[in-house]
Amino acid sequence: MTLEERNQQVRAFFNGKIDTYDNVHSEYMKTKVLLAESLDKYAKKILDLGGGTGLELIHLFELFPQAQVTVIDITENMLEKLKTRDFAGRVTTICGDFFEVPFGKDFDAVITTSAFHHFKKDEKIRLLKKILGCLKDGGQFINCDLIALTAEEEAAQLVDLENNIGYSKHVDIPLTIENEIDALEKAGFKQITSGNGGKENYGLFIARKNISHIS
Ligand SMILES: C[S@@+](CC[C@H](N)C(=O)[O-])C[C@H]1O[C@@H](n2cnc3c(N)ncnc32)[C@H](O)[C@@H]1O
């Protein structure tokens, strides 16, 4: 299955989950809140990749009421739900695939949560390079995502992916912390840190484009 086909499978999956998504993900609020809490204080122009129904933006707009947020997401039903939130007027939504849609430029920060564990490492490096290109110098990339706890788990999920052809449900293929960091380094990010992402199997990764601003 190609990356494009897998991304369409992800889209079909989330389009079908819209009635239950927010309830299921209320358990994951800590993983979402960490994004806003990790942002530089001056952050204003923010790109949220895979923002879905906007759960991470609830806390973000409390902390950053002046933020201008762009959300790119492939799943139209998720974005329709986001558009019903009271902060929707402060969000620009773009419905499309990360690998195809132009990101724009000069963002203070790019954030993402629970959205990048659908990509193989080489695909992720490609995406990270695209993110680097849309950040201001010193800008932040913050990713809170599912991780593989061991190299064996990472490898096993890749095997599941290869065996998944023809099935309707997408397969999660999270990387280990070490591979997440290596992907960020290979893409050209600096000042990379990692920590717990609010659940045992979630990692929080923060990295910068070049030099850091005073936050
Ligand atoms: C688990 S949801 C997370 C939504 C939100 N960030 C949250 O934490 O509640 C993953 C989101 O990533 C989006 N997504 C996954 N792969 C994508 C891709 N290739 N391009 C654009 N959006 C994608 C999905 O459509 C979905 O809305």
Predicted regions and their residues:
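Class I SAM-dependent methyltransferase Rossmann-like catalytic core
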Residues: 2-29
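Class I SAM-dependent methyltransferase SAM/SAH-binding core
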Residues: 47-49, 53-100
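A conserved beta-strand element that flanks and buttresses the S-adenosyl-L-methionine
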Residues: 111
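Short catalytic micro-motifs in class I SAM-dependent methyltransferases
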Residues: 114-115
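A short glycine-rich, Lys/Arg-flanked "PGG" loop and its adjoining helix->strand segment in the class I
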Residues: 125-137
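C-terminal alpha-helical "lid/dimerization" subdomain adjacent to the S-adenosyl-L-methionine
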Residues: 144-187, 192-196
